[in-house]
């Protein structure tokens, strides 16, 4: 199966919270996991914020960040390019999206168009899930099992 993970879903792989078990299961199967290059910065920043807010110890932060960096090569990563952003203006005209949400959805649309395949959009943000559904994606929110 092919999955696109936005950062709200991806973080559940490296920080235990509601929906983490489901996200972990994606890594145990022979799935294709797609992400945007921006997820790299977003994920590390999210882990650092959890460290600052004392939700992660320094040791656990380092462990999570290193694990993420090691697994990064397992993802199919879309670079942030003009080709990926070709439909960005039309997308934000149709939907009230925040900047990085627009990048993630635009990237998933680019993957779908390029592969001509169904992609399950995985996201823990209800608004982005609803928008992705409107754009024709199958959607899974790991927090709503």
What are the residue ranges of the model-derived segments?
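Short active-site oxyanion
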Residues: 30-33, 74-76, 115-120
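Acidic catalytic patch
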Residues: 39-40, 70-95, 102-107
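Short, well-structured N-terminal submotif of metal-dependent ribonuclease cores
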Residues: 1-39, 50-63, 137, 143-145
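Helix-adjacent hinge/juxtasegments
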Residues: 49-82
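Alpha-helical elements of the RecA-like P-loop NTPase motor core of helicases
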Residues: 21, 86, 129-130
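Acidic, PIN/NYN-like endoribonuclease modules and their adjacent C-terminal/linker elements
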Residues: 2, 106, 110-145
């Amino acid at each position: 199966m092919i999955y696109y993970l936005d950062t709200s879903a991806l973080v559940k792989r490296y920080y235990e919270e509601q929906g983490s078990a489901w996200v972990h299961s994606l890594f145990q199967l022979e799935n294709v996991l797609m992400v945007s290059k921006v997820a790299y910065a977003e994920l590390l920043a999210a882990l650092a914020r959890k460290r600052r807010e004392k939700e992660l110890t320094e040791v656990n932060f380092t462990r999570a960040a290193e694990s993420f960096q090691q697994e990064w090569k397992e993802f199919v990563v879309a670079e942030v390019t003009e080709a990926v952003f070709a439909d960005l203006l039309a997308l934000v005209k149709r939907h009230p999206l925040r900047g990085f949400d627009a990048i993630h959805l635009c990237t998933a649309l680019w993957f779908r168009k390029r592969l001509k395949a169904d992609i399950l959009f995985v996201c823990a943000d209800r608004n982005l899930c609803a928008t992705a559904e409107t754009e024709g994606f199958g959607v899974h929110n790991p927090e709503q099992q």
